Amino acid sequence: MAGSSLPRRALGRRLRGYRVRAEKSQLIAAGLHIELSPQSIGRMEDGQKVKICTSQIRDLLDLYRIPNPSDDRDEIFLPWKEVKDQALAAKLAGTTKGWWQAYTDQYEPHFDHYVGLEAAATHLTTHQVVLLPGLLQTAGYRRAISLARDSGLSPAALERRLELVAHRRVRLKDPGFRVDILLSEGVLRHTPGGRSVLADQLEHILELIGSQPNVSIRVLPMDAGSHLGLLVQSFTLFEFPPLASHLVEPPVIFVEGYEGGLYLEQSETIDRHRRAITDIQRVALTEVDTKQLVQKIAKEYGV
C-alpha cells in the first residue's frame, strides 16, 4: 500500500543488524561514510523516512564489510527497491505520505510508528486491561479520554483527534485484516465521559460482535481464575504479510505507557507474549458468551 512502513522497516532492521555485527557505532557510520547525522541513521534503522540515496546505502554496506555480491546485500537492496518503488507510486498518485501523517499535530511522536504498523499489518491481536483499543472506540469515548489527558484541547484539535480514530476504524472493514481483541471485564465497566457515553460504547461493541468474520471480540470475565492476563499489561501484537520481495518481517509487540510507547521485537519476547495470548484465549468467553455479558452490563447502563 502507498505509505506503508513495512519496506522501510525491513530495510532499517537489516541495516541495524549488519551495523551491530560489524561493531560500528551510528556516529561512525554517519560521520565517516554517508554524511548523515547519527539521529538520521537511528531513524532509518527504526524504519522511519530519511532522505538517502542508493550510493549511500552501498557505502554503508561497504563500511559494514558486506561482500559484493552476496545474499546479505540482496537482503538490503530488495526492500530498498520496494521503498523506492513505493515512493514513486505515491508521488505519481499525489499521496507521498500515509493518511495518518496528516494528523501528526494531534498525537505523540511514537504514535506515528504505531499507526504505520497498524496500516501495514494483516493480523492484530490486542489484550487490554483498562481502556478499549482505539479500533473499537466511539467518538464520545475517545473525546472523554482525550480531554482526560489534555483538558485544554481546543474544539478544533479535539475534532481532528476524533477524525483520526474514525479513519483508523475503517480498517476493520478490510477482510484481509484479521483482528483479535481480548478485553478484561473491567474495561467494560470504566465510565470515561459518564454512564451515557459507556452505554453508547457498549451498544457499538454489541453491533460489532459476530458481525464481521475478520474481527473477534472476547472478554475475560472477573471469575476466570488464574491466567497470564493477570500478569501482563495491555499490549498489541502486529503480524505482517511477506514483502513483494518475499522477505518476511517479524512481528512487533507494542506496549503503551503514560510517557510513551515501547516496541519489542526480540523473538523471545514475542514468544512469551504469544504464550500469554494462548493462555488468555483459553479462559476468555466465546463470542456468544461475550455478547451475553456485554448485554448484561449494557442493561446496567441503560442500553
Predicted region positions:
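Short acidic (Asp/Glu) and glycine-rich catalytic loops that position anionic groups and cofactors
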Residues: 37-40, 54-60, 252-256, 273-274
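C-terminal regulatory/effector modules of DNA-binding transcriptional regulators
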Residues: 172-176, 182, 188-303
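Short alpha-helical DNA-recognition segment
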Residues: 23-43
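A ubiquitous short alpha-helical element
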Residues: 42-47, 261-262
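Interdomain hinge/linker segments and adjacent boundary elements that couple functional modules
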Residues: 2-16, 21, 46, 51-190, ...
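Short amphipathic alpha-helical surface micro-motifs
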Residues: 5, 41, 105-108, 114-118, ...
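A broad, structural surface signal
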Residues: 13, 17-20, 27, 39, ...
